[in-house]
């Protein structure tokens, strides 16, 4: 551990302007709306807004496992969110204020439920459908340990 006690973290972290590189706008360290754009909504109860990235694919695979297991309430519409700036649209930021994919909206609840971050979506769906999530506390702890591990690990 450093013995330098002179460093004081800033009260508010500020992002230094991007360097203009090719990928500088897709994963900026800020979030929030940059433009107005509504998101499409399909006919199924679950609306998935994502892209075929490792985190996006996790949710799609789980939804397909639910459907293969006969959980018809897991029908969903998938919408492509290109990470070229679309994730900063007003519609997407309303669902995920962090401006990251994936995000899910469940229209079966009294008010639509928004869920963002792949691990949160996986846990939400597992609990909603009582699928692949043990009820036994020890087994559940083991399951959640692996879920959280994969979230923090590189693909």
What are the language-model segments listed below?
Residues 1-155:
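GST-like domain detector, emphasizing the conserved glutathione-binding G-site
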């Amino acid at each position: 551990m450093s013995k330098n006690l002179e460093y004081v973290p800033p009260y508010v972290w500020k992002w230094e302007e991007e360097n203009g590189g090719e990928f500088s706008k897709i994963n900026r360290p800020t979030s929030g709306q940059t433009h107005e754009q509504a998101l499409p909504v399909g006919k199924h109860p679950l609306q998935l807004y994502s892209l075929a990235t490792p985190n996006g694919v996790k949710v799609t695979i789980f939804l397909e496992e639910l459907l293969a297991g006969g959980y018809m309430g897991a029908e969903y519409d998938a919408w492509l969110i290109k990470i070229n700036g679309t994730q900063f649209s007003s519609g997407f930021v309303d669902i995920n204020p962090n401006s990251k994919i994936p995000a899910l909206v469940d229209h079966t609840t009294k008010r639509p439920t928004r869920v963002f971050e792949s691990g949160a979506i996986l846990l939400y769906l597992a609990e909603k459908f009582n699928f692949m999530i043990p009820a036994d506390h020890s087994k559940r702890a083991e399951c959640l340990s692996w879920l959280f591990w994969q979230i923090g690990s590189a693909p």
